[in-house]
């Protein structure tokens, strides 16, 4: 018996006039999921608590049974782990942009002309040449203009502000301590030095000279944000006795799984958008389940969230239909406890995460099948699970997998 | 106004093919409970939390308003209290079996031929002759081959393993400390000595000589298990200002009530099984309610749980129908707040407790009557209570009894 949490990222929504006052999920044609709903049990779920807007990171941590208020201080550690940086508890990690600054350090392009190549060479210089007292610097490029920075050493703190000014036309923000500790002051100072040194090291780098010659914005400064301390996390397998794996499109979700000690599977062609190679996503999910190497599989597909952020009503609906196609295989598997959910709602009207609960269903043997027959936010609210929380999910799955012990006698 | 929690132990279940995909409760003819559901309010309940499989002990502690994660370390203390051993906070208590060992101390019968008489005489020897340093030994026989052991003294711990090997053909397990404390080492040593001495004291006891002559297995060794420390518990009446009583079939449930400082009522003819004297159970429940001596009554009938453990589909269904007969009198009482529930599900397909929520209903004056008309797991999930927790029950009952104060102004 395998347990699966299948997260359709950001799927939850609100009624949309253009869809006849249906949500994208309600309006989508989803025969596979409807069939599983008909034969399963449904409900709504507050991933963290009612009205709280979860991030994808805090939502997934919660679904894996960790307390996000305890282990989550920022996105950096999970982004870093997601691109295979070997982070350690206590490391301070950041997401970064390669950006373009002019000679006065005014940021003229936060994404450095959406640079697609050469950042590995820039990263090499950063790793070799940045000098920050006794603090070890680990920098790695990610997709496009993105990268991660990890600071390792004694006396560091994550209680500091961001360097990224968020809007062009400004200098990098001076990083400031958020509390009175020496550690916060020291770390803020270190990050400010890092930003300055990045400009000095990158501005005349051959990669950038060539970009300027080609009329492209140079990637001549690095702007850290999303600071967080890498948490002490009890590995998933130690907590539950289940060998776990994560099949996901984005580094953030894979990073969460990595920090939880789970294996991760990369999906060639996955973009995390509605343009993702859905056939490849499909193949890697099904292959992982069928490999029989794992007791527990966390799946995440990201396009519905992206469409929600973009306010793309029909794109979101159509992507949900693509995901339903993936589900056809799972519908016919007998030896799984499948929990299908979103991590949060990303209403196309809000263009960001909201605190609306998400619709969930379970496919498993032995359920108290309810009389809900289609998958939708409002249909699910009438289901036999009523209203649950994200912290309940792994308890419910493990109970249905029959791998839990009685508490008491 | 009297408050009553009526627990039909282990009643919750899952759909069963042999019952036309109904649960035993859904399939049972329950006119009295259906009538109260029609005139009352229904819901589902997670006694501890969703997906957690409660023991009957931890479930009842929760229903009485105690935190099982705080007060529950094992079943022993409640079994001891249930047969009127006067336990004190700090005592270390065990359930025990009288068993049969051969001359090499191999256990050949864990239940000593299901001995029915003479264990009181064996217990007398144990109480008088066992010598365990400065530790006081209190041993008492219970039904059949069962007994309880209480250790009282300084420097004791419940962080030790069991002596019972669980399967015949093995020697008693050497009891081991579960942590590094001196207390755990000392207590493990004490229990190992107790087991050895029990064999020396009982092997040639006249009761056993006679059993051997009659071709019966002798009860010549005592195997403790289910160790727990007797908790400090604020008495029920002090917590709630309600004089409470428990009418139950089994020692475990009465023991929980006793440790909570409640009175208990013994029911002649009660077996805790589906063969119980249901008329006697009925009489003692109704007499206790009508005595007007108590503000709060905890009722437990145990047969549905036993049938669940046995996988006895029709036995479970038929027993629920018997319980419904008991309910006819309660249906017509006006001055009660009656909360009917199971403590946990014991699906006949699982043959053990599961984490499935249990169906509940309340009969009381002034309720927001919902439109559910029959008592069943899936019908209840559509009720006006939605999904509640075991910790909510006494709050709801006391509110409906109108004995609680506003919090604030």
Swiss-Prot record, chains A, B:
Its EC number is 5.4.2.12. One of its GO terms (biological process) is glycolytic process. Signal peptide: none annotated. It comes from the Archaea. InterPro entries: Alkaline_phosphatase_core_sf (IPR017850), ApgAM_prokaryotes (IPR023665), Metalloenzyme (IPR006124), Pglycerate_mutase_ApgM (IPR004456). Keywords: Glycolysis, Isomerase. It is an enzyme of class 5 (isomerase). Residues 160-179 are annotated as: Disordered. Pathway: Carbohydrate degradation; glycolysis; pyruvate from D-glyceraldehyde 3-phosphate: step 3/5. The keyword ATP-binding does not apply. One of its GO terms (molecular function) is phosphoglycerate mutase activity. It catalyses: (2R)-2-phosphoglycerate = (2R)-3-phosphoglycerate. Catalyzes the interconversion of 2-phosphoglycerate and 3-phosphoglycerate. Belongs to the BPG-independent phosphoglycerate mutase family. A-PGAM subfamily. PANTHER family: COFACTOR-INDEPENDENT PHOSPHOGLYCERATE MUTASE, METALLOENZYME DOMAIN-CONTAINING PROTEIN. This is 2,3-bisphosphoglycerate-independent phosphoglycerate mutase. It comes from Methanosphaera stadtmanae (strain ATCC 43021 / DSM 3091 / JCM 11832 / MCB-3). The gene is apgM.
